[in-house]
Amino acid sequence: MFTMKKSLLFLFFLGTISLSFCEEERSADEDDEGEMTEEEKRSIRDKIKTMAIDLAKSAGTGVLKTLICKLDKSC
């Protein structure tokens, strides 16, 4: 009987420790969800920069076409 109690106590102890480790990992994972990595920030900045450059190019092209049209009086 004593051996059975001892082994059950040991199993309870191991289960408690493993549960504690799982809770620590879970709380660490929850903390990281809201943070963006530096690579993600850089990627977003690069996409915005590329979109702004493309927008400026297309706007500049439109202005130049309108200017050429007005100068040639072909509009």
From Swiss-Prot:
Tissue: Expressed by the skin glands.
Signal sequence region: 1-22
SS bond list: none
Top-level taxon of origin: Eukaryota
GO BP, one annotated term: defense response to fungus
Keywords, comma-separated and alphabetical: Amphibian defense peptide, Antibiotic, Antimicrobial, Cleavage on pair of basic residues, Fungicide, Secreted, Signal
Compartments, record wording: Secreted
GO cellular component terms attached to this protein's record: extracellular region
Residue ranges annotated as propeptide in the record: 23-40
Annotated function: Has antimicrobial activity against Gram-positive bacteria S.aureus ATCC 2592 (MIC=10.0 uM), S.aureus ATCC 43300 (MIC=15.0 uM) and B.subtilis (MIC=40.0 uM), against Gram-negative bacteria E.coli ML-35P (MIC=10.0 uM), P.aeruginosa PA01 (MIC=5.0 uM) and P.aeruginosa ATCC 27853 (MIC=5.0 uM) and against fungus C.albicans ATCC 2002 (MIC=10.0 uM).
Family membership noted in the UniProt record: Belongs to the frog skin active peptide (FSAP) family. Brevinin subfamily.
Protein name per the record: Rugosin-LK1
Organism: Limnonectes kuhlii (Kuhl's Creek frog)
Lineage of the species this protein comes from: Eukaryota, Metazoa, Chordata, Craniata, Vertebrata
